[in-house]
């Protein structure tokens, strides 16, 4: 039986009369890329916020790296979050800082005993990992959207997380750059031995990066398996999602 690094059982959350997640069960296994797929507004981002302790569910359990997220105090939750890397949809870089300073910030905040030489080495290694060492002294406004995504991933990797969470990693990117980001997600897993959840509504991203795909439908994961397994379905909701991505889009 594979080891679960994230285990979710009977998860429920509502906002007023709106039931967002209903009796959700899901596992992220060590070393896998798990794609969480669904339309906008289906609760994908809510799920991520629950996993990292930013939202508290109405019911259910969330265990991350053997710890119950809902039972942790703020100090233990902060310690757990250091083991989880979060790659934001908009990269979340500080515009007034250079790339070097953006990557230095989490290091000096969380690993205060590092020497200047060690800090520089970690920054250069992280940038080399994403193929952008040459951008070290540039500011975000000088970079393309794809480059900013890469720098955001580098900043996330600099603390050596065990788990990576990617929020819509290909959103707003052209097809070629999207392929490059998808390949990078796979490379990160191979080089850093991370376990990852990729939140997306992009089927090409799902097919390229996902060892398994979990499709969120009406607040539940109705379909979980390989990409082919998930879409080998007569469910009209599944087929409508597939056709919209691959047929109706220009």
Pin down the residues of each PLM region.
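Helix-to-loop junction immediately C-terminal to a conserved catalytic motif
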Residues: 52
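Conserved ABC ATPase "signature" region
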Residues: 68, 116-134
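Conserved ABC ATPase signature
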Residues: 139-143, 147
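A short, proline-enriched helix->beta-strand linker immediately N-terminal to the Walker B motif
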Residues: 158-162
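Catalytic Walker B motif of ABC-type/P-loop ATPase nucleotide-binding domains
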Residues: 164-167
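Helix N-cap at the start of a conserved alpha-helix in ABC-type nucleotide-binding domains
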Residues: 175-177
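Conserved ABC ATPase "signature" C-loop
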Residues: 218-219
